[in-house]
Amino acid sequence: MTLIEFYDKARIENIAGALLARADKLILVGDQRKAMERSKPVYEELIKERGRSTEVCYVTVNKNNLQNIIEKLDEVIDGNDECIFDLTGGDDLFLVAAGTLIERFAGKVMCHRFNLKNSTVTDCDADGNTVSVESFDVSIEENIKLYGGRIIDNGYKFTFDDEFNRDANNIWSIAKNDLRYWNFCSITIKNIMENCNKAEGLNITYSADARDTTGRKGGSYGLNESFLRSLEASGLIHSLKYGDEVSFSFKNEAVMNVISTPGKMLEVIVASKLSEIKDELGNKLYNDIRVGVMIDWSSEDEQSPTLNEIDVLAMKDAIPIFISCKSGIFDADELYKLQTVATRFGEDYAKKVIVFTSPEMLRGNLEFIRGRADDMGIRRIENPDGISDAEFERLLKSVYLN
């Protein structure tokens, strides 16, 4: 079987058929010779990683010359058996050319179209029936590779299993009661671990004097006993001793990472709740989720690499969802960063979301940020600590639809 794909800037459209079907050959047709040449080894690697052997090649045409497109496609059909046009991508003239050749080679050439937003395929040359595709799961790694980037190992990688999700929800239950205080305590624990911890690994031991020096002058904030007792009661720490010397042990490395990394809690609870959401059949709605994804990429005219970190990145089938999480003051630059990375690694398929707490902290910038987010097609989830968990989950369940 030979798949003929009309090369599109939304690169998932160029390889969707080859990822789903066992094609002998994938032929890219378009006017962007350099782009197709760069894409060829990337597509071959992605297909090979799925255990398939597909030859990838490309044919260059003049996209503004219908006769040239028809002639080139005619040559492709003559030189290959069982040709199938994928009409998912491509400009109008490509589709006109395909229609001409489907009529000319009736019975020899077939065509279909994928709807990647709802995982269906339409048989365009027969009865026009639309059927669901059982599984079109693209991983985060595959999606980033597809668009010419790579993921850099950026510290701890969370596993969102049942136990960790319970821990994440326990952390959220404590933190959302007073997010500013949580952030302060997280910074305090980080400082203790870096500057005055007498123990190692998951164990923390520090003196009262050290504890006092991390406190806020003239205020009641600090790493007080009630805060630590709440962590202990939720099973997040154990063996707590509170006196002239304070000591405790974190439950595990994942919990320690969340509690001792300022800002990590919001990212983790967003990812955790995404991992727990089910579809109508009881299957996980989002097939891949990661926190703190550092992407190394360069645009086609840049020599030096560009690095961007996405707080939470999720995949719904082949749809990437880029999520920025802010638990403090931020400005509109964060929206532009989100827009740039999402467009680069998803084009029109990418979904963009910003989750932020304490909107009142933005003061005069709040309405401007809301307006810019709306103009840029960025979904806003505001003040998640002020809504029920059910409402928070409802909002997260629909982020791939915006």
Where in this protein do the model-derived segments appear?
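A broadly used, surface-exposed interaction patch
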Residues: 25-108
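Histidine-anchored nucleotide/phosphate-binding helix
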Residues: 5, 9-24, 338-339
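Short, acidic/small-residue loops that bind anionic groups at enzyme active sites
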Residues: 83-84, 103-125
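Short beta-alpha junction loops
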Residues: 30-35, 115-120, 354-363
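Intrinsically disordered, low-complexity Ser/Thr/Pro/Gly-rich regulatory segments
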Residues: 145-402
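Short beta->alpha junction loops
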Residues: 6, 55-68, 326-329, 384-385
